[in-house]
Amino acid sequence: MAQRSGKITLYEGKHFTGRKLEVFGDCDNFQDRGFMNRVNSIRVESGAWVCFDHPDFRGQQFILEHGDYPEFFRWNGHNDHMGSCRPVGMHGEHFRIDIFEGCNFTGQCLEFVEDCPFLQSRGWAKSCVNAIKVYGDGAWVLYEEPNYRGRMYVVERGDFRSFSDWEAHSARVQSLRRVLNFF
C-alpha cells in the first residue's frame, strides 16, 4: 500500500511569515480551507509533495521534498500562485522506470534505476519521451530540460501510454530523478 501522508505548511509571506495553512493529506483547493492561492514560502516537515498552480490538482506541477523553501523561486515557481497539493505515493525505496520513444510502449526503450541529469548522455537519441512505465516502489520527476530544469512532472507506479497521461503539454523530457521521501 502506498504511503501517502506527511505534513506541509504553506505561508502567504516570504520567509515563513503571514497566514499559514497546514496540510496533512490531499488538499484539492486551498480556498476551500480559507487560504488564498498566494504562497510565498513552504516548509515540508515530512513526506514528499506535489503542488499545483491551480485547484483540483491541475496545472503546472512542483515537487517539494523535506526542507524549507523561503521564496517561490526555490521550488522553480515563476510566481506565488498555487491552488492544490497532495503527498506523493511512496511504496518503498526500489526505483525503476522505463522510457519509450513511441506511444503505447513502442520504439527505443531505456531503463533507469538512478537519477539521470541528461538522457542523451545515456544513449537516448531524441529529446522526447512518449510513454513510460514506472515499476518498483518509488516515484519519479521528469524534467523538460537537462540538469533537472524546466517544467516538471511527477509520475508514480503505473503505465503511461502517452505524455498526456502524465499531464504534460509535450513529450519533451531531458532529465529525470527519483523522489526522495523523508518521514
Curated annotation (Swiss-Prot):
Tissue spec. comment: Detected in the auditory hindbrain where it is highly expressed in the medial nucleus of the trapezoid body, but also present in other nuclei of the superior olivary complex.
**Beta/gamma crystallin 'Greek key' domain segment(s):** 6-46, 47-89, 95-136, 138-180
Keywords tagged on the record:
Eye lens protein, Repeat
> InterPro entries given for it?
Beta/Gamma-Crystallin, Beta/gamma_crystallin, G_crystallin-like
Q: Which biological process annotations from GO are given for this protein? A: lens development in camera-type eye; visual perception
State the source organism's domain of life.
Eukaryota
GO MF annotations, alphabetized:
structural constituent of eye lens
Say if the entry is tagged with keyword Repeat: yes
What is the role of this chain?
Crystallins are the dominant structural components of the vertebrate eye lens. Also plays an important role for integrity and function of auditory nuclei.
Domain notes for this protein: Has a two-domain beta-structure, folded into four very similar Greek key motifs.
Q: Its quaternary structure?
A: Monomer.
The entry assigns this protein to a family as follows:
Belongs to the beta/gamma-crystallin family.
Identify this protein by name.
Answer: Gamma-crystallin N
Q: What is the scientific name of the source organism?
A: Rattus norvegicus (Rat)
What's the source species' lineage? Eukaryota, Metazoa, Chordata, Craniata, Vertebrata
